[in-house]
Design a protein with these regions (language model features):
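Unchanged
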Residues: 44-68, 77-128, 151-157
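Short connector loops/turns at beta-strand edges and beta->alpha or beta->beta junctions
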Residues: 22, 29-32
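Short, solvent-exposed loop/turn elements at beta->coil junctions and helix N-caps
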Residues: 3, 71-75
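Charged phosphate-binding loop/patch that engages nucleotide di/tri-phosphates or the phosphate backbone
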Residues: 128-157
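A conserved beta-turn-beta hairpin within the catalytic core of GNAT-like acetyltransferases
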Residues: 31-35, 81
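A short linear hydrophobic-aromatic micro-motif
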Residues: 25, 67-72
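Conserved N-terminal beta-strand and adjoining loop/helix that marks the start
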Residues: 1-23
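A short gly/proline-enriched turn/hairpin at secondary-structure junctions
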Residues: 38-39
Length: 157
């Protein structure tokens, strides 16, 4: 497992990569998700942006390089938040990291949506990615730093 001593445990990210009617899933090896096929993701490292974190997590966990397209979901809890992105495959062959997962594959979307070992959250986020709508990064200099995400009219007109 990764050493998360330099990790902000309150902020995490995930991404949904869909290519040729298939979604990239990894079979988790520990915790409550052990044996479940999930979308890649993890915690932000200190000073890391959410978009950089999701790119890093995909590369570490699956060997796949992705570009971030838009935000498709936000889960806010009492002590944490979780951003879900739609991501686009750029390069790389899917492979297990041999640590956090023991298998990685491009799974047919219909198969994934019907499997009991694919959690509801993963299915919900795959459906969000398929809907074709999401929040985009909006070029805007924020007073306190960070990134503004919103619906860009030019994309959705």
């Amino acid at each position: 497992m990764n050493d998360h001593s330099n990790t902000n445990w309150n902020w995490s990210v995930t991404g949904v990569a869909i290519r040729d009617g298939k979604v990239l899933l990894a079979r988790h090896t520990y915790g409550g998700g052990k044996g479940k096929w999930i979308i890649p993701g993890g915690y932000l490292e200190n000073g890391e942006s959410p978009t950089d974190a999701v790119k890093r997590e995909f590369l570490e966990e699956t060997g796949v390089v992705v570009d971030v397209e838009d935000v498709i979901g936000i889960r806010c809890g009492e002590k944490n938040w979780y951003l879900a992105f739609r991501v686009q495959w750029v390069s790389g062959e899917a492979r297990s990291d041999g640590d956090e997962n023991d298998a990685v594959e491009w799974m047919d979307i219909n198969e994934a949506m019907g499997r009991e070992d694919v959690p509801g959250l993963t299915k919900a986020l795959v459906q969000c990615a398929l809907n074709g709508r999401g929040l985009e990064e909006i070029p805007f200099e924020t007073q306190h730093g960070g990134t503004l995400w919103g619906v860009a009219p030019s994309r959705h007109e």
